Amino acid sequence: MKGPAFSKPLKDKINPWGPLIVLGILIRAGVSVQHDSPHQVFNVTWRVTNLMTGQTANATSLLGTMTDAFPMLHFDLCDLIGDDWDETGLECRTPGGRKRARTFDFYVCPGHTVPTGCGGPREGYCGKWGCETTGQAYWKPSSSWDLISLKRGNTPKDRGPCYDSSVSSGVQGATPGGRCNPLVLKFTDAGKKASWDSPKVWGLRLYRPTGIDPVTRFSLTRQVLNIGPRIPIGPNPVIIGQLPPSRPVQVRLPRPPQPPPTGAASMVPGTAPPSQQPGTGDRLLNLVQGAYQALNLTNPDKTQECWLCLVSGPPYYEGVAVLGTNSNHTSALKEKCCFYADHTGLVRDSMAKLRKRLTQRQKLFESSQGWFEGSFNRSPWFTTLISTIMGLLIILLLLLILLLWTLHS
């Protein structure tokens, strides 16, 4: 009796490359997690390229993260048209041609996502009306899903000679290259969330009432460079004197001045020793002291009993106040650098000093109470005794009243 065809041993079905594939996936995931920190700063370069001529219309570099490095890009329409544009006679070779280009509206169609019927590169992805997503035209083309918006700059159409300053330097208003058709490219919300791992392409067409609208195409590319190894986070190298906090200075009463002895030469007072630079501990304690003073001035009722803690998480040290009894609030906050404070100030010496201050506060509280109220606080059993005696007296009084009422009736 023959066995089924799929009854081979299990070891023959195991892929020998399986462990290596799993290891490669884990390594790749670890690398991606290491380099995909949203706070890492890169050198980001955006480049606008005329695909008809291969020339760069704009190249802008800046430092930023992958979520905020989206600047406005400024370039000229003639950088996309070139010296000669198709067979329509439009060109940017002469001042007159550049000035004429300012009189036309334009519209832009995306090539990275081409809707049905919008054509290909030959049509500039604008094969029919409705494919345009942005531009500067009387019908105001727009889109809610495209990655960019492209509009004219703030130069009015009826101003500017469009003369090249390198050729006609004596003409007022001449610009480098005769550029007088400024464009502004902005990233939309969809563009800031999109993936820019590969270039994105758009088609641009000048609108003419009659004839064929001339076509050009441009691409937008992002290049990301690592600015170098990350600097480890640690103590500020500028702050010198990483010293522990100094002990509080004991205040001494000034001694009365003594007259100099007779015949003694007058002594020139020496210069005072320079004050010691505060250490790191003093700086941190000053932060807590400042937080206490601000809290005591703004909300004095909240400084009756509170804990002020140094939160060591970047980017700042913060004062945290917790109201309540003198329980272990610091463990709930998971802090190791907390100071108890009340209206008398911060306690920074030791827990013994803290207990002493709490004892003084308790004595002050008890001294403000009457003897009867204080007896209840000092003797817990006294409350139970009084309650028991009062209960028995009330029962006896009720029995006596019931007995008198029975005899009377």
From Swiss-Prot:
Could you tell me which InterPro entries the record lists for this protein? Answer: FMuLV_rcpt-bd, TLV/ENV_coat_polyprotein
What cellular-component terms does GO give this entry?
host cell endoplasmic reticulum membrane; host cell plasma membrane; membrane; viral envelope; virion membrane
Q: Where in the cell is it found?
A: Host endoplasmic reticulum membrane; Host cell membrane; Virion membrane
Q: Record's Gene3D superfamilies? A: 1.10.287.210, ENV polyprotein, receptor-binding domain (3.90.310.10)
Question: What parts of the sequence cross the membrane?
Answer: 385-405
Keyword Membrane applies: yes
The record's Gene Ontology biological-process terms are: fusion of virus membrane with host plasma membrane; symbiont entry into host cell; virion attachment to host cell
Topology Virion surface: residue spans: 33-384
Q: How does it sit in the membrane?
A: Single-pass type I membrane protein
Q: Which UniProt keywords apply?
A: Disulfide bond, Fusion of virus membrane with host cell membrane, Fusion of virus membrane with host membrane, Glycoprotein, Host cell membrane, Host endoplasmic reticulum, Host membrane, Host-virus interaction, Membrane, Oncogene, Signal, Transmembrane, Transmembrane helix, Viral attachment to host cell, Viral envelope protein, Viral penetration into host cytoplasm, Virion, Virus entry into host cell
Q: Which residues lie on this side of the membrane: Intravirion?
A: 406-409
Q: Which residues are glycosylated?
A: N43, N58, N296, N328
* Role, per record: This envelope-like membrane glycoprotein is responsible for ligand-independent activation of the erythropoietin receptor EPOR leading to the abnormally rapid proliferation of erythroid precursor cells. In the first stage of Friend disease, constitutive activation of EPOR by gp55 causes uncontrolled, polyclonal proliferation of infected erythroblasts, leading to polycythemia (massive increase in the number of mature red cells). Host susceptibility to SSFV-induced erythroblastosis depends on the expression of the truncated isoform of MST1R receptor tyrosine kinase (MST1R isoform sf-Stk).
Question: What miscellaneous comment appears in this entry?
Answer: Compared to other gammaretroviruses which possess 2 envelope proteins (gp70 and p15E), gp55 corresponds to a gp70-p15E fusion protein with a deletion of a portion of p15E. It is encoded by the defective env gene of the virus.
Task: Share what the entry says about its subunit structure, partners included.
Answer: Homooligomer. Forms heterooligomers with mouse EPOR, probably via their respective transmembrane domains. Forms covalent heterodimers with mouse MST1R isoform sf-Stk, probably via disulfide bonds.
Q: What is this protein called?
A: Glycoprotein 55
Q: Which organism is it from?
A: Friend spleen focus-forming virus (isolate 502) (FSFFV)
Which lineage ranks, top first, belong to the organism behind this chain?
Viruses, Riboviria, Pararnavirae, Artverviricota, Revtraviricetes
Report which gene this protein is encoded by: env
